[in-house]
């Protein structure tokens, strides 16, 4: 199967996708009513899109193409408002977080959608287990070769993005001991983790053609790498973040990725090499397991650095780019988060340590998303 030509898009434009949890009070388990909400809110949208994801307990909010984080925030805020209104009318809740802390995957209903039903046929129970919730950020690129360079550059900071956004410590009623347990769910999939090495867009087109020989790949959407190019949109898509508990944090993460993309493509601080990925999964694991307290290792020098310290260095590097893009508020907020030493996974554990229950935790998450 041939790959579409890379659609030229304006560099550094943004698109944000948030996979939200649809909750059924008063037990605060996952609901199976996303179709009801989607039908209710679609006629009210003036920008962006609200659509299905894999199962009926998932609802995806997606912006249109945005020039900056302020425009993205306005679109997401408008969608948030109509979703919350419809959820209230149907006695449902909405919240963020990378996993629901006590749902049972066996109860999840795969959406009545041709693509998802085909995926269920290919992957069986793994698809129901993939009822987890992430944030994806698209960044516009001028051409395919820039997209491949940007993908490799951003891959250096996958642990940083995971650690900052980690919000999935609980799963199936248990503390997983991970800051981000969500990404572990995908470890059984054949396309888990980093994209196979290519050095330019022509090589990527050849890679895609060979992957399509498996008959499991019909489009880019069927490849679930941590970061992937999207030729139809003319973007690079970062897919490793847990869905945050607040819209503000989602915007901050998008601002960081946009600013990092600008820094990478204007400064070209790395010469991508296949050996860059030698310790990729080890460093990714550190971020998932320990969050900002994780330790990453340089594949060339063996130097070991605490993720919190290296994240502060990244934030300093991208600050000039953030100012040019109007994303400096995002960098300032994330810098403060790192200096305070926490992420949302840590907050969740503190809630439970203070005597809260998992049911109470989900209730609190719904209140946070509703701004209560």
Curated annotation (Swiss-Prot):
What Enzyme Commission number does this protein have? 6.3.2.2
Q: List the disulfide bonds.
A: none
Catalytic activity field: L-cysteine + L-glutamate + ATP = gamma-L-glutamyl-L-cysteine + ADP + phosphate + H(+)
The record's InterPro entries line, in alphabetical order, gives: GCL_type2/YbdK_subfam, GCS2, Gln_synth/guanido_kin_cat_dom, YbdK
What keywords are assigned to this protein? Answer: ATP-binding, Ligase, Nucleotide-binding
Q: Name one GO molecular function term.
A: ATP binding
Q: What does this protein do?
A: ATP-dependent carboxylate-amine ligase which exhibits weak glutamate--cysteine ligase activity.
Q: Which gene encodes it?
A: ybdK
Q: Its quaternary structure? A: Homodimer.
Q: Pfam families under this entry?
A: GCS2
Task: Please give the name of this protein.
Answer: Putative glutamate--cysteine ligase 2
Q: Which organism is this protein's natural source? A: Salmonella enteritidis PT4 (strain P125109)
The UniProt similarity line reads: Belongs to the glutamate--cysteine ligase type 2 family. YbdK subfamily.
Indicate whether S-adenosyl-L-methionine appears among the record's keywords. no
One Gene Ontology term of the biological-process aspect is: modified amino acid biosynthetic process
Q: Which SUPFAM superfamilies match?
A: Glutamine synthetase/guanido kinase
């Amino acid at each position: 199967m041939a790959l579409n030509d890379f659609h030229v898009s304006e560099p550094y434009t943004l698109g944000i996708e948030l996979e939200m949890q649809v909750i059924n009070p008063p037990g605060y388990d996952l609901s199976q009513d996303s179709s009801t909400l989607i039908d209710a809110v679609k006629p009210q949208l003036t920008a962006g899109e609200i659509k299905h994801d894999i199962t009926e307990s998932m609802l995806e909010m997606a912006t249109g193409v945005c020039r900056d984080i302020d425009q993205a925030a306005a679109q997401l805020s408008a969608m948030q408002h109509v979703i919350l209104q419809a959820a209230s009318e149907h006695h449902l809740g909405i919240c963020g977080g990378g996993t629901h802390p006590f749902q049972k995957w066996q109860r999840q209903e795969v959406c009545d959608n041709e693509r998802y039903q085909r995926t269920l046929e290919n992957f069986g129970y793994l698809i129901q287990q993939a009822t987890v919730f992430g944030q994806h950020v698209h960044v516009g690129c001028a051409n395919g070769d820039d997209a491949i360079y940007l993908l490799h550059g951003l891959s250096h900071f996958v642990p940083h993005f995971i650690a900052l956004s980690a919000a999935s410590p609980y799963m199936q009623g248990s503390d997983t001991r991970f800051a981000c347990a969500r990404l572990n769910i995908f470890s059984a999939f054949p396309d888990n983790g980093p994209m196979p090495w290519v050095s330019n867009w022509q090589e990527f087109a050849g890679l895609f053609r060979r992957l399509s020989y498996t008959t499991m790949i019909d489009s880019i959407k069927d490849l679930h790498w941590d970061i992937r190019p999207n030729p139809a949109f003319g973007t690079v898509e970062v897919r490793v973040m847990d869905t945050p508990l607040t819209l503000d944090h989602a915007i901050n993460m998008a601002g960081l990725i946009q600013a990092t993309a600008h820094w990478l493509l204007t400064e070209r601080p790395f010469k991508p090499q296949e050996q860059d990925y030698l310790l990729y999964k080890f460093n990714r694991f550190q971020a998932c397991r320990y969050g900002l307290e994780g330790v990453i290792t340089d594949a060339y020098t063996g130097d070991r650095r605490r993720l919190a310290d290296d994240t502060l260095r990244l934030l300093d590097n991208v600050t000039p780019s953030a100012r040019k893009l109007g994303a400096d508020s995002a960098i300032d907020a994330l810098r403060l988060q790192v200096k305070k030493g926490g992420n949302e996974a840590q907050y969740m554990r503190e809630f439970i340590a203070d005597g809260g229950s998992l049911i109470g935790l989900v209730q609190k998450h719904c209140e946070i998303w509703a701004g209560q």
